Amino acid sequence: MAKNDLHLTRNIGIMAHIDAGKTTTSERILFYTGLTHKIGEVHDGAATMDWMEQEQERGITITSAATTTRWKYAGDTYKINLIDTPGHVDFTAEVERSLRILDGAVAAYCAVGGVEPQSETVWRQADKYNVPRIAYVNKMDRSGADFFEVVRQMKAVLGANPCPVVIPIGAEENFKGLVDLIKMKAIYWHDETMGADYTIEEIPANLVDEANEWRDKMLEKVAEFDDALMEKYFDDPSTITEEEVLRALRNATVQMAVVPMLCGSSFKNKGVQTLLDYVCAFLPSPLDAENVVGTNPDTGAEEDRKPSEDDKTSALAFKIATDPYVGRLTFFRVYSGKIEAGSYIYNSRSGKKERVSRLFQMHSNKQNPVEVIGAGDIGAGVGFKDIHTGDTLCDETAPIVLESMDFPEPVIGIAVEPKTQKDMDKLSNGLAKLAEEDPTFTVKTDEQTGQTVISGMGELHLDIIIDRLKREFKVECNQGKPQVNYKEAITKTVNLREVYKKQSGGRGKFADIIVNIGPVDEDFTQGGLQFVDEVKGGNIPKEFIPSVQKGFQTAMKNGVLAGYPLDSLKVTLVDGSFHPVDSDQLSFEICAIQAYKNACAKAGPVLMEPIMKLEVVTPEENMGDVIGDLNKRRGQVEGMESSRSGARIVKAMVPLAEMFGYVTALRTITSGRATSSMVYSHHAQVSSSIAKAVLEEVKGRADLL
């Protein structure tokens, strides 16, 4: 690929709720761009993008496969790197990870379901990473499909600025095609060629007025972002050319000022080519993005890199996958410079140079070998020994650390053991590999019981992990019952003097600190340790202060009630003293750990549990039962709405501890007619009676409360 083709590159992802038809849409894109010969249907478990066996069985997408494809638009051939992201709440890490490296996204919605809870979560994640997007309303052929209602919801629920650039011709089973408001033509797809052919005709007479009205709204919206267009819009809108509209829409989209909206039915092969055209027309290329900013690991200074192959190399590893044929594949996005097969590249986290033996561009899980991956492109490499998700790969002579991604902490854990003791090594090897791939999945050994506990974002997440252990690593596991990841907090401030002295012949140990330990300030929102140093006059030498801080940070991993980590803590180091010979960094660290244990026991320790934001869609007649059941589960109903299809939407906050097996219970209450989705919201204090029960179970005693 020539260097100047970067403006024809699009790194995009499709983000959506579970059933918005995201994988089907990706499949159609691959079909029309000529990469797949037979369309893979999710219904029959043959979709090319869903390449792990469990995905094909469950019909949901778990790992974002990165696929490179090409599309001709307006006389140019565009290169599209397509990242398929999962929509299930348990897989937020995958979504965060892919959004970090995209330039633009297609937000897919179901024309019947509209903006669903997960769509909201993903939308906010895309805002966080400043990803411009266009929206695609899928499933226009389904009964209850309503494009304009989804436009309204995008405004109301997401606070977006939607701008329809097409309107549907018909809906539900009469959905025939689209009116393109930019070209002012009607597009009809041919069923006999699976939608590969379509005809462009005049707009049907009964839609002319509606099309003119929506075109006018579109022009008014984009004219705000283009002065020349604004003048024409007020003088004589009929003189506005197609090129001017496309240019203004592109600028407004790249600035994230508007979200162009399209619609179609991927399953019925209608609307996908228009979507591809407008991906090329409106979404940014790597050149539209600002220079990537990172920090120099040696000096801590901020540096930026241009999206050009001539600049020094910088790339971000965004996914690690184990492939049965080539071993460990590392997916990365190159921001500047280039990575060549057979060359050495520096990892700024590990401080080591690694040889990239081979490079691939992926088509789903088939690899096409390439020699070089340049700035603005996405690819995968083999040969890395020590690499984690979020690592920066760069030039050893010009090291840089790009902003990594932050992932939510796991909320649910289960103890696992292999069915046969001889599989113990296989299990620990498998778990270590899976934890490398997925930052929201953690493995630890419970100190009291010696059991291996795996933690993740939900029951489905852990089911899939156990399933993968069986398939990929051939280890069958016994599982304990799910455990909630509680946290602890303290409610009072305690002033304490702690002295640590040890004489054991020769040089001793000595540290003396006076601290105030209590809850964090209200404006300290990031959690963790808030450390304030108020020591005057060198009573504790400067070099020992970080050791005190480190001691508290280490100690916070184990609370005094039941060993759960402390959510947040404020420590003010007021004063202290030291011994010129016996004091060292370790003495002050141990002193801080002792101070923590003694102070927290007196500081009103409480237990905190994860609270989930739950949304249940249920038929009207089951409403009472659903709410009654939520009350039994200590749920707080926060609101009820009616959906267009006549169902009721119940929104509630419910403790995770009460939600195990909820999907099955809900099915029973509503005879399988209700659906639910839940996402972690926050940790909240547990009432003392429940805290006592939890402590009895975990510690066998509850006398600390």
Swiss-Prot record:
Cross-referenced InterPro entries: EFG_II, EFG_III, EFG_III/V, EFG_IV, EFG_V, EFG_V-like, EFTu-like_2, G_TR_CS
Keywords assigned by UniProt, alphabetized: Cytoplasm, Elongation factor, GTP-binding, Nucleotide-binding, Protein biosynthesis
GO molecular function: GTP binding; GTPase activity; translation elongation factor activity
Listed Gene3D superfamilies: 3.30.230.10, 3.30.70.240, Elongation Factor G (Translational Gtpase), domain 3 (3.30.70.870), P-loop containing nucleotide triphosphate hydrolases (3.40.50.300), Translation factors (2.40.30.10)
Compositionally biased spans, kind Basic and acidic residues: 302-312
Annotated compartments: Cytoplasm
Superkingdom of origin: Bacteria
One cellular component term from this protein's GO annotations in UniProt: cytoplasm
Disordered: annotated span: 291-312
UniProt: GTP binding residues: 16-23, 84-88, 138-141
Domain tr-type G positions: 7-287
Protein name listed in UniProt: Elongation factor G
